[in-house]
Swiss-Prot record:
Carbamoyl phosphate binds at R55, T56, R105, H133, Q136, L268, P269. It is an enzyme of class 2 (transferase). This is Aspartate carbamoyltransferase catalytic subunit. One of its GO terms (biological process) is amino acid metabolic process. L-aspartate binds at K84, R166, R229.
């Protein structure tokens, strides 16, 4: 039973045992959705999106509606008092009066942590800059445990933008908590994993990893391939973005080199890093991953609201 946990700012806010509770509850919801369709009757979720989002925002909204709750919020901060100079602290204080739980995406690292200081209701971090995206991580873990029979003993390839990709940083931190996982980090040097991940996560936890630049050299050894897009919004230089955007494209030829039981994951949206021909491959798991994301958010909100 999760006790005294008011916010989800990063995956480390939950113990491994508490994460297992959430995943088990998500599986119950998947198996028996009607049993949960009114569990959040009378509850209101506020969605505060200071950055553009389609899948994460709609996933949260669908999750709360499927639980019987209601939604309020914004996806365009310029249409709110924020455009008049209202501080994050004041916004959170006001919104926590109107709602029972808040999910927030913000371009500044640490914004969700700041919000949690001023909120009287649970805060769920839906992404803060290039820092953390914990509910995507929960979706990733639920996908892996469901499709690969648990969260231990995997060789995980992570490919693309490892520098700015907050989903990548959160996933490495989370999977490092489980047993005998190894990482293959695939990126151009310009988008390599940050040094703090190497030192504070991988080295500190004695996690085996290698860094390479060619996907085709390592794909045959992988149990899981986690693809990411090169994020245009993190670049100040258009030429550099265009040069790196097409660094890695997963196509049928590369899939032919992979294990029969490898799964391909992606946090979405994709640009062109996964060819559409791969969608027909039974190993393509990214749309299933998005579906799992909704169910794990349902389970998370049930736990944080204490309605079960």
């Amino acid at each position: 039973m999760i006790k005294d946990i008011k916010h989800l700012i990063e995956p480390m806010d939950f113990t491994v045992e508490e994460l297992d509770e959430i995943f088990n509850l998500a599986h119950q919801i998947i198996a028996h959705p009607k049993e949960f369709s009114h569990i959040c009757d009378g509850k209101i979720l506020a969605t505060l999106f200071y950055e553009p989002s389609t899948r994460t925002r709609l996933s949260f909204e669908a999750a709360m509606m499927r639980l019987g709750g209601k939604i309020l919020g914004f996806s365009e901060p310029n249409s709110t008092s924020i455009s008049k100079g209202e501080t994050l602290a004041d916004t959170i204080k006001m919104v926590s009066i109107y709602s029972d739980i808040i999910t927030m995406r913000h371009p500044k690292e640490g914004a969700a942590k700041v919000a949690s200081i001023y909120s009287n209701v649970p805060i769920i971090n839906a992404g803060d800059g290039g820092h953390q995206h914990p509910t995507q991580t929960l979706a990733d873990l639920l996908t892996i445990t469901s499709l690969k029979n648990g969260l231990n003993n995997h060789r995980i390839g992570i490919c693309g933008d490892l520098k700015f990709g907050r989903t990548v940083h959160s996933l490495i931190k989370a999977m490092s908590r489980y047993q005998n996982n190894k990482f293959v980090l695939i990126s151009p040097k310009e988008l390599a994993i940050p040094q703090y991940i190497r030192e504070e996560v991988l080295a500190k936890n004695h996690i085996e990893y290698i860094e390479v630049e060619k996907l085709e050299d390592v794909i045959e050894s992988l149990d899981i391939l986690y693809m990411t897009r090169v994020q245009k919004e993190r670049f100040f230089n258009e030429e550099e973005y265009l040069r790196l955007r097409d660094s890695y494209i997963l196509d049928r030829a590369k899939m032919d080199l992979a294990k029969d039981d490898m799964i391909v994951m992606h946090p979405l949206p994709r640009v062109n890093e996964i060819a559409y021909e791969v969608d027909e491959d039974r190993r393509a798991s990214y749309f299933k991953q998005a579906e799992y994301g909704m169910y794990v958010r349902m389970a998370l909100m049930i736990k944080l609201l204490g309605v079960m």
